[in-house]
Amino acid sequence: MSTSTQNIPWYRHLNRAQWRAFSAAWLGYLLDGFDFVLIALVLTEVQSEFGLTTVQAASLISAAFISRWFGGLLLGAMGDRYGRRLAMVSSIILFSVGTLACGFAPGYTTMFIARLVIGMGMAGEYGSSATYVIESWPKHLRNKASGFLISGFSVGAVVAAQVYSLVVPVWGWRALFFIGILPIIFALWLRKNIPEAEDWKEKHAGKAPVRTMVDILYRGEHRIINILMTFVAAAALWFCFAGNLQNAAIVAGLGLLCAVIFISFMVQSSGKRWPTGVMLMLVVLFAFLYSWPIQALLPTYLKTELAYDPHTVANVLFFSGFGAAVGCCVGGFLGDWLGTRKAYVCSLLASQILIIPVFAIGGTNVWVLGLLLFFQQMLGQGIAGILPKLIGGYFDTAQRAAGLGFTYNVGALGGALAPILGALIAQRLDLGTALASLSFSLTFVVILLIGLDMPSRVQRWLRPEALRTHDAIDDKPFSGAVPLGSGKGAFVKTKS
């Protein structure tokens, strides 16, 4: 950024087309958050109407996780081959079909399939929309682009909680899904006329189509084996999250099988840069493991241990969700000021100061608890708004949408595991202590993984010939690309 532009407010560096593109993508993220909270809120009504068991009802939430990894891969590859815009439109169409099908669903099977479709749309939304917005904004604003965009998820969660209390008592649970289709239509209209991302256009101008992750896995020499492994992974995830398996050893074995399959896909598609991809999946996995126990079980904690009534629970959840939304935006500013990794680490360290007081204060003073949750979620959950920027920087433009979509949505399986871990620990401790200890300990794992730049470090250890020394999005150096103590002079920009 030149000296002459430093005095211009950041928002004036963006033109109308860039803001329109951002709005179209942000609405998609709002719908993601809206749907996540929506299915949890109406679960008891759906269970009662369809006569479902508790396991069947819970599987409707898990269904989205079962299909997300494949949606991230498929729609991400579409974005790499045909452009980010087409993948964004396809994602929102999948979302629309799934949402409408939920509203019209006559029974469990139809709704389960609809949730699978929604999961694919959600995954494509994350990979394509995040990549599109980040690549469309100027390099010095790309942490803001990422953070502002992800704030839509938290806003959607807050909106869903408020709409639920107004709509369901009068019109029933199906009306919520029909209401959810309105912003989808608006987002689709916005996306129809947005320009293609600048980075993608520059990369593909006058060049032959790239070989995408889908081409490598499903059209290459190992395509038959990979197709079989895809079905095996889907079946294993179904049994893990919806199959009512009581044997922990079997569940662990199936989980390990899925991990082997996903790592195999990453090794095949990333070539010599597979260590980076595998470490990024671990980063996302632990990011979900530290944050989602609170996301999923906070309402239960407020109802059971603090004995709050539904109105008070809604108020506290508003503080939590709004804090996360604000934190995404704050994280964007911090990331552009301090750098992505340094901002991430500083924010998580600050959040650690608040996590114990949140669950130690009790329920006597609702407003103090709400404020503590606001700031803890702002610092601990909100900083995840720049996670797409962090992940995307490790991938070249030609592979970024699929790389981001696949690594994030495989790691997002931690969101399905996190509530289970919290509930298991709560069998020996009270729920508040379980949530605090789980979040506190696992946050340090993420701090180490990001702070030490382990994706670059492990790449340097295992396959140094394919090491990327600079962020592909903003050209800033990767600290893990050189040995400790080598100094800034050791950074020599390399192509990958």
Swiss-Prot record:
Reaction catalysed by this enzyme: N-acetylneuraminate(in) + H(+)(in) = N-acetylneuraminate(out) + H(+)(out)
GO annotations of cellular component type: plasma membrane
CDD domains: MFS_SV2_like
Membrane topology type: Multi-pass membrane protein
Keywords attached to this entry: Cell inner membrane, Cell membrane, Membrane, Sugar transport, Transmembrane, Transmembrane helix, Transport
InterPro entries associated with the record: MFS (IPR011701), MFS_dom (IPR020846), MFS_trans_sf (IPR036259), SA_transporter (IPR004742)
Pfam family, one: MFS_1
Entry's localization field: Cell inner membrane
An MF annotation (GO) of this entry: sialic acid:proton symporter activity
Regions that span the bilayer: 22-42, 58-78, 86-106, 116-136, 148-168, 170-190, 224-244, 247-267, 278-298, 313-333, 353-373, 378-398, 406-426, 431-451
Keyword Cell inner membrane annotated: yes
Biological function: Catalyzes the proton-dependent transport of sialic acid.
Family statement: Belongs to the major facilitator superfamily. Sialate:H(+) symporter (SHS) (TC 2.A.1.12) family.
Protein name, UniProt field: Sialic acid transporter NanT
Organism: Salmonella paratyphi C (strain RKS4594)
